[in-house]
Regions:
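Switch/connector loops and helix/strand junctions flanking conserved nucleotide-binding motifs
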Residues: 64-67, 209-214, 250-256, 460-461, ...
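Glycine-rich phosphate-binding loop of nucleotide-binding enzymes
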Residues: 138-242, 469, 498, 543, ...
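Conserved ATP-driven motor cores of ASCE-family P-loop NTPases powering translocation/secretion/packaging/pilus
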Residues: 230, 469-470, 474-560
Length: 579
């Protein structure tokens, strides 16, 4: 053992130690705080020296010799009773080297784990080394030392996905998701081959926090910059980001994004009727989990197939279509000229009216090739849902030049949907996730695609079925092999589908409310950690990963990018940079 180790106490001998937990009697001039890492060495007969690494889960102080309540005053104020202060720390074992599972000997010195010993306690030595190092710094401990994640359990090598839970507003879930992404992009060696052409899709579902990821933060301090440097990163905003917002609803505003918080550098998006049909987006108008119980989704799938068969492009009108029976001679794979009186579909409203003429005609029976033999009430419910979607989603479908979201343009794509109705939000999320999923099918893991989705409980609730939930479950189950990595954030993990939570190798939690903290979904926490989770301040998270058998508490630094308009550092933002 090295002479410069800091001895902080002795393994307590007044009670039995175990291989899982032991207590430390602290020296008078030393201290341990919760989350500190320690190591103790035991000479085991016939096995040699065994190192036991542990994490402090609780500390305690007692006056030895005081047995009555009034003895505290007598010993400390009046001096009429002799008592001695005893300070102890409870330690949860996290690793034993070599793996000879014996309890540490009572009376053995306990040292603060620092340097290489601390890295061994956190299993960093098993996360590779040199060019193959897979240890990614993702936060700082209480003593300002890096906390690492094994990237193998995020990028699909051994596991995939991250789940972040916590109370809205104080748990800083989205902030930590972005910080984690910044760690990935700043340490390409840790990600290895996966760092090449990594694409990130982020949905801005609340406020305007994510529309300034490329702008310096005027409130960023030198102390925060030092914290970033301790993690081996240059404190700077994201350097490759594109921003997208829905196009304004009115025709006079063609191509203008509906983004009041930021106008510069934001592109407008929508789908043309041709793209709507080709990408099979109709089912994403039926994302209410109750629709599946009424066979509405069956009708939606049937109509979607028919739209693909019937759609013909219109000559001279980009993105517009007409519906013609593929069995008729007038159907063509080339752009066609509409007949007099034939409905040209240039908007979602036009499409809904044309669908109605097939599935619910005024003067005839529904076409069974469009509705099969479902009950008339189901067809009526299907059309009611379609008409109900028009005022909420209609602005997102319009003929004209293509304004699809181009995820290939930059490394990070931010899609702003916070001003849309919830039904329109689900439509956009469903369409984009399905696009990512479809692109990766059969193409191998690389390049990796990361999806960051807040309010996951809206898209993958515990109960019910929807096309979005179905796609998210498939990503959770097969994302490792597809190269699609999900970072999901939610207030309550107990409200999320178990298949999605169960497949998240990395679990993170901010502050939890008391009732939520007791749910079984947080069984990965130690009892002491659950109690503390109710008190966590913004910027403090609890991290669980398969590499380490105990949860780790970390803090992440203040972001160098702005999170609202008033934080933008205009002096540091040069509009002519690069020209």
């Amino acid at each position: 053992m090295l002479d410069d180790r800091r001895e902080v106490g002795l393994v307590l001998g007044s009670e039995a130690t175990s291989t899982q937990e032991f207590r430390v009697l602290l020296h008078d001039d030393e201290y341990l705080q919760v989350d500190d890492l320690v190591v103790s060495y035991t000479d085991v007969p016939k096995a040699g020296e065994v190192a036991t690494y542990g994490i402090v889960t609780e500390t305690a102080t007692v006056l030895e010799g005081a047995s009555l309540e009034g003895d505290t005053r007598r010993a400390t104020v009046e001096g009429t009773l002799y008592a001695e202060k005893s300070r102890t720390a409870t330690v949860q074992t996290v690793r034993v080297l070599p793996e000879t599972w014996v309890a540490p000997d009572s009376g053995q010195p306990v040292y603060k784990a620092t340097g290489a010993e601390r890295e061994r306690a956190l299993y960093v030595d098993e996360m590779g080394g040199g060019e193959s190092a897979r240890a990614l710094p993702v936060g700082l401990s209480r003593d300002d030392e890096p906390v690492w994640v094994d990237v193998d359990f995020f990028d699909g090598t051994k596991g995939a996905h991250m789940s972040i839970s916590g109370v809205s507003g104080v748990a800083t879930k989205t902030s930590y998701a972005l910080f984690f992404l910044r760690c990935l992009t700043a340490h390409p060696k840790s990600l290895g081959k996966g760092a090449r052409n990594l694409k990130v899709l982020v949905f801005n579902v609340k406020g305007q926090d994510l529309l300034f990821l490329d702008k310096p933060n005027a409130r960023f301090t030198e102390d925060a910059a030092d914290a970033w440097r301790k993690l081996g990163m240059d404190p700077a905003p994201f350097d490759s980001v594109s921003f997208w917002a829905p196009a304004l609803a009115h025709g006079a505003s063609e191509g203008v994004p509906d983004s009041r918080a930021r106008t510069e550098g934001v592109e407008a998006f929508r789908w043309t009727p041709r793209e709507f049909v080709d990408e099979r987006l109709l089912p994403f108008l039926f994302t209410d989990t109750g629709d599946s119980r009424q066979q509405i989704t069956f009708v939606a799938e049937r109509v979607t197939r028919q739209l693909e068969r019937f759609a013909c492009d219109v000559a001279g009108r980009e993105g517009a279509i007409v519906l013609r029976d593929p069995n008729d001679a007038i159907h063509s794979d080339e752009p066609v000229v509409p007949f007099p009186g034939e409905r040209v579909i240039e908007s979602l409203g036009d499409l809904v009216e044309e669908i109605a003429s097939y599935v619910e005609p005024d003067d005839a029976e529904p076409d069974p090739s469009w509705t099969s033999r479902v009950a008339p009430g189901t067809v009526s419910a299907f059309m009611r849902r379609l008409y109900g979607a028009l005022p909420r989603v209609g602005r997102l479908v319009k003929a004209g030049p293509s304004r699809r979201i181009d995820r290939a343009r930059e490394a990070v794509t931010v899609v702003d949907i916070h001003d849309l109705h919830e039904a329109a939000q689900r439509f956009v999320v469903g369409a984009m996730i399905a696009e990512v999923h479809g692109e990766k099918e059969g193409r191998g893991r690389f390049p990796l695609s990361v999806i960051v989705l807040d309010e996951l409980n809206k898209y993958a609730p515990r109960d019910g079925w929807s096309p979005i939930k179905d796609t998210l479950i498939d990503i959770a189950q097969r994302g490792r092999s597809l190269g699609i990595l999900l970072i999901g954030a939610q207030q309550s993990a107990s409200r999320i589908d178990p298949d999605i939570l169960g497949n998240a190798s990395i679990k993170v939690s901010g502050r939890l409310d008391s009732a939520e903290a007791e749910r079984s979904e947080y069984g990965w926490m130690l009892p002491s950690t659950r109690a503390r989770a109710r008190l966590l301040k913004p910027g403090t998270m609890v991290l669980s990963q398969p590499s380490i058998p105990a949860p780790t508490v970390l803090e992440f630094p203040y972001p160098p990018w702005a999170t609202r308009p008033e934080e933008v550092d205009e002096a540091a933002s040069d509009p002519f940079e690069g020209l």
